[in-house]
UniProtKB/Swiss-Prot annotation:
Catalytic residues identified in the record: D397 (nucleophile), E452 (proton donor/acceptor)
Protein name: Probable retaining alpha-galactosidase
Disulfide bonds: none
Binding site residues for Ca(2+): D179, E446, E452
Similarity annotation: Belongs to the glycosyl hydrolase 97 family.
EC class (word): hydrolase
Signal peptide: 1-30
Keywords: Calcium, Carbohydrate metabolism, Glycosidase, Hydrolase, Metal-binding, Signal
Cofactor(s), by name: Ca(2+)
Source taxon at top rank: Bacteria
GO molecular function ontology, one term from the record: metal ion binding
């Protein structure tokens, strides 16, 4: 009897295991032409619907949230030199799993991350027997897919991937440039001008937002841009290279949609969550922080003057800023700008500056042109030398390409700089498509129409937190109070708020010492500024109109707001947590900046007067009797 029970129990267990296996991997039947992939929170998060046309064998992907369409059925597919895998497809199997990860980043809007995504791998065969997998992931804040090609598939000739929006969608787009630096403008998605657009494009339909993004981009592939034809709500994926070379198995980058209400999209870490885990084992040397950036402050003369740089070091030390960034000129021929001195190692004053700065608690980072690091031999000359001198980081400029060859260069420079304990800031570059999870010493990247541009608008400033800065750290370089060309020139409080609003692991402060000393309230605020955050919350905003974000560090919240349009009183709902809080506001007054402390409840709505195209900054801390300031040194 006991033996019979054991046999019966074993048979039941075996049947259960077999049933689970069949559920996971069984080939689809002929009638299976539509499949749904839901995230962990199926009721509130996005849902992906994959459809295989029975007549053409073509694939489409549709995305919805809360029963509303976010993405209309949009074509999928990839073309290789051996096969067109966009038509004539047949499903041969499926596999499902849950992706659950926990990781920490050195910088970003939230350093501790908990990831939970559902993943379905669809296996397809095309005409002639060619094979590929489509991997679809869905989380509470996004949908992503990638193509996985087996070895022998050959080079990639393009994708048929596209994003088709609802006809009533609104778009915020930046025209494509090879350095990803351009203004964001608002259009109806269907009637935006014909052209190419940067891949970080934001769309909104009846209160739900979707941000197109890319993750896990490396030299195995080529970067994407969006190609649009006016009159159609479709944005096609175009690659930098007409042919992407591949001599083995290939996983393409993730094509991602960050989906949700505006707060969900703004606070999302989805592009990092999709990226590979950190490849830097020891991260103890990676330290974010504000930097005094000397280019807008001192221009060409500063880059070639040891005495000027020592002055900047003195000022940074007084402010408690951990870094000074020496920009272009320091290794140029003294008589020829933009020409590398062949004896730069012997002639350089950087070692003296590093010693001077170290004695004052300041680290030195240096600018380098990409052309001086584009070969292995050059990197073997430069990087060990900089490490030996004690330089803390490099700002590498003018890649100006997202080709496969350039991405392969990134694959080489990233482990090399990590090996020599050099923090990295890329300028004239691609944008951080998950790179800061995989390579945590990447503190920030440009890829933005930043402070040095003379054509920015207030609308552009209010769009960046919802587009480019969602993707990863953004070296906008705020704080240039001395520049009359900035769009918020009438609002020093608005300029100050950008230092919080725009996240960057090295927050390069672009003002002159004189401009900070003329604004002691701004100077005091920037002395308190962290560069890495425990969490981020959107308090208020809409792209092109306003943006107010709160970022937490330790027990304090830093708040920054920027607005486009006429002077008004902004109503800002606080999301600081329970209890009573002191909100230490910095506002524009009739004769300059003014400080206005207020005691509020953590869920109150804050009324803030802002000037035209202006803004504000604030620090919030738990209030107790007698507390009048949120400064670190305050009682």
């Amino acid at each position: 009897m006991a033996r019979s029970v054991r046999r019966t129990t074993l048979a039941l267990l075996l049947s259960a295991v077999l049933a689970m296996t069949l559920f996971v991997t069984a080939p689809a039947h002929a009638q299976d032409s539509t499949w749904t992939v839901s995230g962990p929170s199926a009721r509130s998060g996005p849902q992906a619907r994959l459809q295989l046309d029975a007549t053409t064998g073509a694939l489409t992907l549709q995305v919805s949230r809360g029963g509303r369409t976010v993405l209309e059925p949009s074509p999928l597919g990839i073309r290789t030199e051996g096969a067109d895998l966009s038509r004539g497809l047949r499903l041969s199997g499926r596999e499902r799993r849950v992706v659950a990860e926990r990781y920490r980043t050195a910088v970003g809007k939230q350093r501790s991350r908990d990831v939970r995504m559902t993943e379905t791998r669809f296996r397809f065969r095309g005409d002639g027997g060619a094979r590929f997998d489509l991997v679809v992931r869905v989380s509470d804040d996004g949908v992503a897919y990638r193509y996985v090609l087996p070895k022998g598939s050959g080079d990639v000739l393009g994708e048929t991937s596209a994003f088709t929006l609802p006809t009533d969608a609104t778009a915020w787009l930046g025209a494509y440039r090879r350095d990803n630096e351009n203004l964001f403008n608002q259009y109806p998605a269907a009637t935006a001008p014909t052209g190419e657009y940067m891949a970080q494009a934001l769309f909104e339909t009846r209160g739900t937002y979707a941000l197109i993004a890319e993750s896990d981009l490396s030299g195995r592939y080529s970067a994407a841009r969006l190609i649009h034809e006016a009159g159609l709500p479709t944005y096609r994926i175009g690659l930098w290279d007409e042919r992407v070379t591949s001599d083995g198995a290939l996983s393409t980058p993730w094509r991602a949609l960050v989906v949700g209400d505006l707060a969900t999209v703004t606070e999302s870490t989805f592009t990092d969550d999709l990226a590979p885990a950190s490849r830097v084992a020891d991260t103890s040397w990676i330290r974010p922080g504000p930097a005094l950036w000397t280019w807008l402050a001192g221009g060409k003369p500063a880059g070639q003057s040891l005495s000027m740089q020592k002055g900047y070091v003195d000022y940074a030390a007084q402010r408690g800023w951990p870094y000074v960034v020496v920009d272009a000129g320091w290794y140029f021929d003294p008589d020829q700008w933009d020409v590398t001195d062949p004896d730069w190692q012997t002639n350089s004053w950087i070692p003296e500056l590093v010693t001077y700065a170290r004695e004052r608690g300041v680290g030195i980072q240096v600018w380098i042109h990409h052309r001086d690091l584009d070969t292995a031999e050059e990197r073997e000359q430069w990087l060990p030398t900089l490490e030996r001198w004690g330089v803390k980081g490099v700002k590498i400029d003018f890649m100006d390409s997202e080709s496969q060859d350039t991405l392969r260069w990134y694959d080489e420079i990233l482990p090399a700089t990590a090996a020599h304990h050099l923090l990295v800031n890329f300028h004239g570059s691609t944008i951080p498509k998950g790179i800061q999870r995989t390579w945590p010493h990447v503190m920030t990247m440009e890829g933005v129409n930043g402070e040095e541009k003379r054509v920015n608008t207030a609308q552009h400033l209010t769009t960046l937190p919802f587009t480019r800065n969602v993707i990863g750290s953004m070296d906008f370089t705020p704080g240039a109070f001395h520049r009359p060309q900035r769009p918020n020139a009438a609002s020093d409080a608005g300029e100050l708020g950008l230092s919080v609003l725009y996240e960057s692991g090295i927050q390069n402060l672009a003002g002159t010492p004189e401009s900070y000393d003329a604004r002691p309230l701004a100077r005091g605020f920037l002395e308190q500024l962290p560069a890495a955050w425990d969490r981020t919350r959107l308090l208020a905003g809409r792209p092109g109109e306003s943006a107010v974000l709160a970022r937490a560090s330790g027990g304090r919240w830093f708040i920054g707001g920027t607005f486009a349009g006429a002077a008004h009183t902004a109503e800002v709902p606080l999301r600081l947590g329970s209890g009573t809080w002191l909100v230490d506001l910095v506002l524009d007054g009739p004769d300059g900046l003014v400080r206005e402390p207020r005691v509020v409840r953590g869920g109150d709505t804050l009324s803030v007067p802002v000037v035209a195209d202006g803004g504000f900054a604030a620090i919030a801390c738990h209030w107790r009797p007698g507390r009048t300031s949120c400064d670190r040194t305050a009682a």
